[in-house]
Each structure stands twice: as C-alpha cells, then as structure tokens.
C-alpha cells in the first residue's frame, strides 16, 4: 500500500 511522506521539504 502507498504511504504518503509525513515530512515535506521547506
């Protein structure tokens, strides 16, 4: 299953 990233770069 796909798990979206919890942290995104600024």
Curated annotation (Swiss-Prot):
Cross-link (Cyclopeptide (Phe-Pro)): 1-10
Modified how: Processed by the macrocyclase-peptidase enzyme POPB to yield a cyclic decapeptide. POPB first removes 10 residues from the N-terminus. Conformational trapping of the remaining peptide forces the enzyme to release this intermediate rather than proceed to macrocyclization. The enzyme rebinds the remaining peptide in a different conformation and catalyzes macrocyclization of the N-terminal 10 residues.
Impact noted for substituting residue 1 to G/Y: Impairs the inhibition of the mitochondrial permeability transition pore
Applied uses, from the record: Antamanide reduces multiorgan injury induced by IL-2, such as lung, hart and kidney edema; but does not have the toxicity of related cyclopeptides such as phalloidin.
Annotated function: Cyclic decapeptide that belongs to the MSDIN-like toxin family responsible for a large number of food poisoning cases and deaths. Counteracts the lethal action of the Amanita toxins phalloidin and alpha-amanatin if administered before, or simultaneously with, the poisons. Acts probably through competitive antagonism. Its concentration in the fungus is, however, so low that the toxic action of the latter predominates. Shows immunosuppressive activity, probably through the inhibition of the action of interleukin-1 and interleukin-2.
Similarity field: Belongs to the MSDIN fungal toxin family.
Protein name: Antamanide
Lineage: Eukaryota, Fungi, Dikarya, Basidiomycota, Agaricomycotina
